[in-house]
Amino acid sequence: MSSTSPNLQKAIDLASKAAQEDKAGNYEEALQLYQHAVQYFLHVVKYEAQGDKAKQSIRAQCTEYLDRAEKLKEYLKNKEKKAQKPVKEGQPSPADEKGNDSDGEGESDDPEKKKLQNQLQGAIVIERPNVKWSDVAGLEGAKEALKEAVILPIKFPHLFTGKRTPWRGILLFGPPGTGKSYLAKAVATEANNSTFFSISSSDLVSKWLGESEKLVKNLFQLARENKPSIIFIDEIDSLCGSRSENESEAARRIKTEFLVQMRGVGVDNDGILVLGATNIPWVLDSAIRRRFEKRIYIPLPEPHARAAMFKLHLGTTQNSLTEADFRELGRKTDGYSGADISIIVRDALMQPVRKVQSATHFKKVRGPSRADPNHLVDDLLTPCSPGDPGAIEMTWMDVPGDKLLEPVVSMSDMLRSLSNTKPTVNEHDLLKLKKFTEDFGQEG
């Protein structure tokens, strides 16, 4: 390279500082600095170094620093168990001479393992989400499969003995906004004896070299210690996409660790269910896809499920909609996902507020008192048209805070919001999902 790039200079500075800390006996600080320096060196090799000779030289330096980092790691690991003479730079550590015992009894006292497990503790859902099966409209096939995989083995363990074993991996796939994550919340609520781990890719990806796969390993270790347990990985495609020549070494290592932990030789996953969710299942690595024994398509809701969603999202809000109105809304929203319907209802719930804001006239009506809803009063004010009998010219600013009676949500509010909200799922994605279902999945 003609001149030293900022990244290369940073790597050199870090390595120099690491060597100083190493000589001073500050081994923990030195280890962090060596690892950090290697990250910068690898970045330079990948994106900045010109010519094979420069790359070869940097790689050789990296190997040297990594070897030293490993020796320091071994020393720090054994430090708590026995007083041991610090290793001089360039000398082999006692762990090299006596054999690596990191897989033996000392692993439970491994400070690094504890740190990684503490990092994952936040992923354990301690408070159960309050989502019942009845709160999930439609998706009967998916609900039955999840009950079969999660609820039945906990309630009737004697049913699942011998060759009859519960499912260990279930993949929920489908268009965005169809309730995949919501179903996982229902599982967490209903499986009240299970430990529920809700994981996203950010929980498992680390900037430090080699730490991401350790996080994956420790996640499964935590799940085994707290079984029966459910590991829910949202947007699993971001962690386990198809392997290619262009992917980074870190991504490949995460994938390999997932494969080993989900069903590797000598791995005991009894009592552990891995639940994955994705909108783009065709990008998943084929080996990862095979680990998910059940692949359930979560489709766009049917008309009856859409009608039920309108009802669920309205909740206890005052409205004038009839059963026939809900059925009509279900028919009019073909191609809309559950999330789209949620947005329509939220917008419709704001329509009465907009009427209050834009009203130029209000009239007095009878209604429940704000102080005591069981007591009716005659001096509440509600928006009206200027021609209404008893209309008083005023704006919402003139209405006392406890005297406003907002209009109820009506069918016309729903239709107005529906006309302003377009579906978020396109036909092209639906065709790809349908093809994937035909090839690898089952209908939910």
Curated annotation (Swiss-Prot):
SMART domains: AAA, MIT. It is found in: Late endosome membrane. Residues 78-88 have a biased composition (Basic and acidic residues). InterPro entries: AAA+_ATPase, AAA_lid_3, ATPase_AAA_core, ATPase_AAA_CS, MIT_dom, MIT_dom_sf, MT-severing_AAA_ATPase, P-loop_NTPase. Residues 19-82 form a coiled coil. CDD domains: MIT_VPS4, RecA-like_VPS4. GO terms for molecular function: ATP binding; ATP hydrolysis activity. The modification Phosphoserine is found at S93, S102, S108, S410. Its main location: membrane. Residues 78-117 are annotated as: Disordered. ATP binds at G174, P175, P176, G177, T178, G179, K180, S181. Its EC number is 3.6.4.6. Pfam families: AAA (PF00004), AAA_lid_3 (PF17862), MIT (PF04212), Vps4_C (PF09336). The keyword GTP-binding does not apply. GO terms for cellular component: late endosome membrane. Proposed to be monomeric or homodimeric in nucleotide-free form and to oligomerize upon binding to ATP to form two stacked hexameric or heptameric rings with a central pore through which ESCRT-III substrates are translocated in an ATP-dependent manner. In vitro, associates on the inside of a helical tubular structure formed by a CHMP2A-CHMP3 polymer. Interacts with CHMP1A, CHMP1B, CHMP2A, CHMP4B and CHMP6. Interacts with VPS4A; the interaction suggests a heteromeric assembly with VPS4A. Interacts with VTA1. PANTHER family: AAA DOMAIN-CONTAINING, VACUOLAR PROTEIN SORTING-ASSOCIATED PROTEIN 4B. Belongs to the AAA ATPase family. This is Vacuolar protein sorting-associated protein 4B. The lineage of its organism: Eukaryota, Metazoa, Chordata, Craniata, Vertebrata.
